[in-house]
Amino acid sequence: MNKKSIRDVDLKGKRVFCRVDFNVPMKEGKITDETRIRAALPTIQYLVEQGAKVILASHLGRPKGQAVEELRLTPVAARLGELLGKDVKKADEAFGPVAQEMVAAMNEGDVLVLENVRFYAGEEKNDAELAKEFAALADIFVNDAFGAAHRAHASTAGIADYLPAVSGLLMEKELDVLGKALSNPERPFTAIIGGAKVKDKIGVIRHLLDKVDNLIIGGGLAYTFVKALGHEIGLSLCEDDKIELAKEFMQLAKEKGVNFYMPVDVVITEEFSETATTQIVGIDSIPSNWEGVDIGPKTREIYADVIKNSKLVVWNGPMGVFEMTPFAEGTKAVGQALADAEDTYSVIGGGDSAAAVEKFGMADKMSHISTGGGASLEFMEGKELPGVVCLNDK
């Protein structure tokens, strides 16, 4: 990575404004999944050990520019203190006199959590005045919020106009892993693209067709490709306005020598529920009033075989409606194949794929699970991320 990280700067005694991603799911004031807090710990601990005054900023939920009581970061600060085993202070605002006083009272190695930055309308507008207010609290800006790196907001990008800007350790790892995958992949390189909609994955498929050896398609978006081949798909998801594009992608794969894998059999159902009756049919045999909801067993075997023989696999998007037990087997099989593959480096591209490997207890078997769904998607589309572009070059 050609951007400076916290390892490249002197931090002792410095006030560090560190943008983290503490956007954790909450239920009745309790954190239901603390993965993102844990992911930020190495950076926070490094800053503490180096004798920095650590000022943490994050968003939580979508308060839309005003204070919302249940979206305060108070429970997050409390949990962070437990995880760090030290006292963590919490400010009730993200800038201004109260925050400044609390920062002024900090000693080296102290940690302070600012209030939810999205309580201020200027945050999502990347307002220069708000960015200046944030910058006034600190000497250095650290961006460790890969999950928000595709956003040009005041605390993720704007602040870098007023302070030296470097990446945290999590951001650095994300950029290294994803960057290496796209620029210098070990081969065979396989991408698995799933999820519901073709339109969400157009950029990724287009960009990856230039880079991969194998492209595996699954999830709801597969049926648009199936229909493009002339098959009936019953009531399965389909984007009729993307059929020509699907044909174009399949033609491109052929021209570029990319192996393009699609389901050969599918799990179908007449009702969308936990207790649904399902059948397995060939891809060209979906009855008119049934819908495809998962990849079938033959497809799972083919996909698992491709995975096993790959050196690098990037997975973005589930193979079926994995949240419901009868439609989860395809996604589980792909996860299991990645978990079992001995010589394969597996990169899970955040979002639903990450949720799936967590749900099936396979997370510790994956080489890298990205902490940013939208950010990793845009990175894989070859787009520049505002929260990365703004960092100082080495």
Swiss-Prot record:
The modification Phosphothreonine is found at T299. Signal peptide: none annotated. One of its GO terms (biological process) is gluconeogenesis. The modification Phosphoserine is found at S183. It is an enzyme of class 2 (transferase). ATP binds at K201, G292, E323, G350, G351, D352, S353. Pathway: Carbohydrate degradation; glycolysis; pyruvate from D-glyceraldehyde 3-phosphate: step 2/5. Its EC number is 2.7.2.3. Gene3D superfamilies: Phosphoglycerate kinase, N-terminal domain (3.40.50.1260). Substrate binds at D21, F22, N23, R36, H59, L60, G61, R62, R118, R151. It is found in: Cytoplasm. The keyword Nucleotide-binding applies. It comes from the Bacteria. It catalyses: (2R)-3-phosphoglycerate + ATP = (2R)-3-phospho-glyceroyl phosphate + ADP. GO terms for cellular component: cytosol. Keywords: ATP-binding, Cytoplasm, Glycolysis, Kinase, Nucleotide-binding, Phosphoprotein, Transferase. GO terms for molecular function: ADP binding; ATP binding; phosphoglycerate kinase activity. Its main location: cytoplasm. Belongs to the phosphoglycerate kinase family. HAMAP family: Phosphoglyc_kinase. PANTHER family: PHOSPHOGLYCERATE KINASE, PHOSPHOGLYCERATE KINASE 1, CHLOROPLASTIC-RELATED. Monomer. This is Phosphoglycerate kinase. It comes from Bacillus cereus (strain G9842).
